């Protein structure tokens, strides 16, 4: 374990001082011994304290650590960020630029991870898609740059495409939710990602496509590889009960933009599946006839594809990573080959990764949700009725890991809806659900929790394991319409090599690489670190 005086960075007990002394303390994730951080944490903590003392012009800054809020950084704040970076990098003798020699600091992935969620995103693995030096400085800058106009436009276009594919669910329980306690609201929010994933799977099997599809994987820091089905269950890391930093493993997650069947036959409508309780296999056999293609969507203000070599290479590796993550969750081994494994093993793999992801996000996966929260989820998301029925009436859910876990739990985990008045929900439940919900108002065989619903989500992955295509696509959009498509053959060996290189950077085993000199005029003008970047000013000085 780290010494008491140097525990501050990993524990992230952050005191935020803005607007005349506003202070907030955050609970800390556990630490599983990070000896490589011991010499550097005091320096880094001093840097954090200095940075968080600078004033802000925006009086609506949320009561959260500055480094994780997305408010616009004015020039004065940018100067403060850069000034403190100079101090952190011990650059006084190099002024006005950052030191040429990389200081001994916590590795970039630790510095960049959110305090309550010790994990990284897929995009953080794309360290040099723009400039790796910028990625490096961003990790330690303790504040994110304000999104550009292009980024805001891209977010809006992605949201529009998502809503076009997946009809936004209507909240029919607003009046009921007005009486929710803060705990009940937190429970409902913690289920959002899980409910979206279920919805995406059902839409994939009913309309042949899904957008914003959650994926997750675990990186072995020693081998620089992703963990596959053959090694996953051996890791103590996946059996933790709370967020932690780990010497050996890093959790990575992201959202795949678009998953689409290349040969789709109009199958069952989502509503009919709800009414008739069709099985997942029925949906698959009815609608999905061809391979499922992983697609990444890039949005543009004008119908022009970038010519930047680094950006294009980054796009190709990004779509490869999404394909890799989804393949691993569906039973492929790290070489990208379908392993001779059983449906149960695929269930267990997906279940383990999803539970670990929820834990690293700080969620209590075993906390039974309030019964009223469960019914609100059903009213707003009627397509989960089949899953709720299984949790209610079945002794076994068909996932050996979950069934074994539940058998070892005490009766404190029971869940009872018999005390809830069903009439309170009759006005907001769809007619097709009214009769089926009657059996839910009793004592359930299993509690409704993130863990139990995840055990049922894992059943979707064997359905797609043999249907993932080796072809991937990048689709470029402007104003909601695709104007160009690039096709790439999935190359798992190349992705493994890419992963090895990027993980070395993220864990501090190699220094960042600057961009090509020829790219400096095009890229450095958009970087908030240009004024203190020695490399940029050496070849293109700021005047």
Curated annotation (Swiss-Prot):
What protein name applies here?
Answer: Exonuclease V, mitochondrial
Report if keyword Secreted is assigned.
no
Q: What class of enzyme is it?
A: hydrolase
Q: Which InterPro entries match?
A: EXOV (IPR019190)
Give the GO biological process terms: interstrand cross-link repair
Q: Transit peptide residues?
A: 1-26
Described purpose of this protein according to its UniProt entry: Single strand DNA specific 5'exonuclease involved in mitochondrial DNA replication and recombination. Releases dinucleotides as main products of catalysis. Has the capacity to slide across 5'double-stranded DNA or 5'RNA sequences and resumes cutting two nucleotides downstream of the double-stranded-to-single-stranded junction or RNA-to-DNA junction, respectively.
Q: Which family does it belong to?
A: Belongs to the EXO5 family.
Q: GO molecular-function annotation terms?
A: 4 iron, 4 sulfur cluster binding; DNA binding; metal ion binding; single-stranded DNA 5'-3' DNA exonuclease activity
Q: Kindly list the cofactors needed.
A: Mg(2+); [4Fe-4S] cluster
Q: List the disulfide bonds.
A: none
* Cellular compartment(s): Mitochondrion
Q: Which positions does UniProt annotate for [4Fe-4S] cluster binding?
A: 131, 524, 527, 533
Give GO cellular component annotations, separated by semicolons. mitochondrion; nucleus
Task: Return the cofactor note field.
Answer: Binds 1 [4Fe-4S] cluster.
Q: How does it assemble?
A: Monomer.
Alphabetically list the UniProt keywords.
Answer: 4Fe-4S, DNA-binding, Exonuclease, Hydrolase, Iron, Iron-sulfur, Magnesium, Metal-binding, Mitochondrion, Nuclease, Transit peptide
* One Pfam family of this chain: Exo5
Q: From what superkingdom does this record's organism come?
A: Eukaryota
Keyword Iron included in the entry's annotation: yes
Its Enzyme Commission number(s) read: 3.1.-.-
